[in-house]
């Protein structure tokens, strides 16, 4: 038999805890500066899910689990799939009709989400949870549901076999504790400081310890036995102090935790999960004072709808937020997004989740669709043909848009060396055209151009814009303050590459979309020849994430004899201030390092940026290049 209803307690305080978790996640995704650690709401959800699912599977007394696996999995499917599939379908339709630029992103994400494998899809396609620009996936939040569903497939079998072998809940809890440590150690080992932590953040292997902590708690602290409301006053005071301390720790983590802090992945998440487990244990006790506070009706309402709220909030935010607004939220926009999310979650709860969970798919489909079919039979032939034509037209339209969305607009990596250009002066003009075409269709190819032709085009174009005299003069005349210049950067470096070529007669440019500081450390070995007093190195990094002080110091040490120009960043993400602070400290600490203050200039001119708030339009690229030239001349 399936032990779902036997001795099962409803604990309203857990709904309040769900509300706290989902609100933390929403504030994080809304990019509030005071909720940098709001993503820990997912940690709370994982621990709570492990606790509840194990409590449901375990009998109230004894160690024999008589479980109907098929019945369990069908119930999980009823609980999770309908609302998720509705959200996926609605999001795809919205993107097809109104936001076709996202189609190339959503297409694969939607398919992987249907099979609850999106977390591994994101890992294999290197989609960062923290720093994707230009085409953010509105389905990215489904990674956590994928982990839970994968866990629900494996855990019941493990629990039944484990109880059969161990014959004791305490011994099985000890085994699970070892698995917790293995998963946490794996997260620590796979994590690379200063790099993008998305691999360990998305991975089922590196996040399962949070679910397992909840499972172990259910074995040693079963909610079905916590029925006594009588505690000695001393123990009651201890309970109240413990739950208050645990809750305060989680609140402080929401405020202070940073997704790029190495501590988070080397014991920090384990600490947060254990704290969440302690809080859950306290709230489940009938004598819990905090449990009563969390039972406040509005919090319970949020908690019972937390699944739908979690599903809908992210696509609502992504599809309705201009990226230039990220980090600078508009109050009434936020209110509107929250209202829309709650309305969608309420509709999903009442018309999809609850009916299917209680009635099953067949009863629900009969109730909803049979009378619609009867109405369809009475519809005229002309009306039926019209509806069919509209559906067909939408499908054709969507297919056409999918083709457009699949085209890549910008190169992902580009390397330029003026030395190679000078060496290839005998190349025919037809070969140059072929090389340009190859560059367009193969962004990973290393390309060489003629610097002279581009410079002439630039000069002729600048003559028509006399309002930009200062910048134009700086760009027209090469700034030969160093015999050779090396420029290393990310996608912003790609944006300014053509202007750098026109400003420096002897420049090597190496830019790549998504480049992190950790990747630049490896790249520096290829450019050892630039570590000389008569050479200059421009470093433009920090767009894609935070880096440690040791990493930037190591990169600067690679070019300790050259003069280095650090370009600070303007990026609508939480790590912006930390990156710029670190760059400023390095500029003050090293005599051969100069800071190029792009951030101050960019803040005053939002028109310098494309709609993603990160990459540059031509005017912005000219301005940034002019700042670099000015810094090198001074």
Swiss-Prot record:
Signal peptide: none annotated. Residues 414-429 have a biased composition (Polar residues). Residues 430-447, 455-470 have a biased composition (Basic and acidic residues). GO terms for molecular function: acyltransferase activity, transferring groups other than amino-acyl groups. GO terms for biological process: lipopolysaccharide biosynthetic process. It is a multi-pass membrane protein. Coiled coil: none annotated. Its EC number is 2.3.1.-. This is Putative peptidoglycan O-acetyltransferase YrhL. It comes from Bacillus subtilis (strain 168). The lineage of its organism: Bacteria, Bacillati, Bacillota, Bacilli, Bacillales. The gene is yrhL.
